[in-house]
Curated annotation (Swiss-Prot):
Stated name of the protein: UPF0598 protein C8orf82 homolog
Superkingdom, natural source: Eukaryota
Residue pairs linked by disulfide bridges in the UniProt entry: none
PANTHER family: UPF0598 PROTEIN C8ORF82
Family under the similarity heading: Belongs to the UPF0598 family.
C-alpha cells in the first residue's frame, strides 16, 4: 500500500466519525456507511466531485471550497487510480472507483469525474490542462481542436484519460476564458466552428460528441 493510501483512509475516517459515520443515501437510491467493512480488512468510502472539480465525501451536508479535499498527495493518488466501477458494488450509483490496496473509494459526479481547472503554460512545452486540483501531477496535453462546446447545457468539454471516461468537463471560469478564442460561422451563431489559438485558426473536430452523448447520466 502506498503511503498516501493511509492518509486517505485516516482522513476519511476522521471526517466520517465527525458525522457519526451515519448511514446515508447520497443520491436517494443507495445506502452506505462511510468506512464500512463488507469483507475482512476491506474498507469502503464514498465521494462526490462537483462541476468545479472539487472532491467531497459524498454524504457531506455542506459542499463548498472550505469542505472539499485540498491535499495534493491525496488528490493525485485518488484521481490517478480512478477507473470505471466494475466491482459489482454500487455500480449504478457510483460509476467510478479508485482502489488503494484493500480500500475501495467509490465516486459519483455532478457531470464528469474529470474537471479541468487550470491551463498550465510552459515555455518549453505545449500547454497542459490540469484537473481536479492535482496541478502538474494531474495534467494532460491541451488539444484546442478537440474542445467541445455543448449547446444543450452551455458547458465546455475536452478529452480526458480513457480510464476516467475519455471526456472531461472544463470548469466554468476556464471555459469563459477559452470562449474568447472561439469563432462562430454565419450559419451557426450558437455553436463555434473554429478556435483561434497561438496565432492559428483551428477547426473544431467535435469528435467527442458521440462519446459524451452516449455516456449515461451521472
Amino acid at each position: 500500500m502506498w503511503p498516501p493510501c493511509g492518509a486517505m483512509r485516516n482522513l476519511a475516517l476522521v471526517l466520517a466519525r465527525s458525522q457519526r459515520a451515519r448511514a446515508c443515501s447520497g443520491n436517494e437510491r443507495v445506502s452506505y456507511t462511510q468506512g464500512q467493512s463488507p469483507e475482512p480488512r476491506t474498507r469502503e468510502y464514498f465521494y462526490y466531485v462537483d462541476h468545479q472539480g472539487q472532491l467531497f465525501l459524498d454524504d457531506s451536508k455542506m459542499k463548498n471550497f472550505i469542505t472539499c479535499f485540498k491535499d495534493l498527495q491525496f488528490l493525485v493518488t485518488f484521481f490517478s487510480r480512478l477507473r470505471p466501477n466494475h466491482s459489482g458494488r454500487y455500480e449504478a450509483s457510483f460509476p467510478f472507483l479508485s482502489l488503494c490496496g484493500r480500500e475501495r473509494n467509490f465516486l459519483r459526479c455532478e457531470d464528469r469525474p474529470v474537471v479541468f481547472t487550470h491551463l498550465l503554460a510552459s515555455d518549453s512545452e505545449s500547454p497542459r490542462l490540469s484537473y481536479c486540483g492535482g496541478g502538474e501531477a494531474l495534467a494532460i496535453p491541451f488539444e484546442p481542436a478537440r474542445l467541445l462546446p455543448l449547446a444543450a447545457n452551455g458547458r465546455l468539454y475536452h478529452p480526458a484519460p480513457e480510464r476516467a471516461g475519455g471526456v472531461g468537463l472544463v470548469r466554468s471560469a476556464l471555459a469563459f476564458e477559452l470562449s474568447a478564442c472561439f469563432e462562430y460561422g454565419p450559419n451557426s451563431p450558437t455553436v463555434p466552428s473554429h478556435v483561434q489559438w497561438q496565432g492559428r485558426r483551428i477547426a473544431l473536430t467535435m469528435d467527442l460528441a458521440p462519446l459524451l452523448l452516449a455516456a449515461p447520466p451521472p
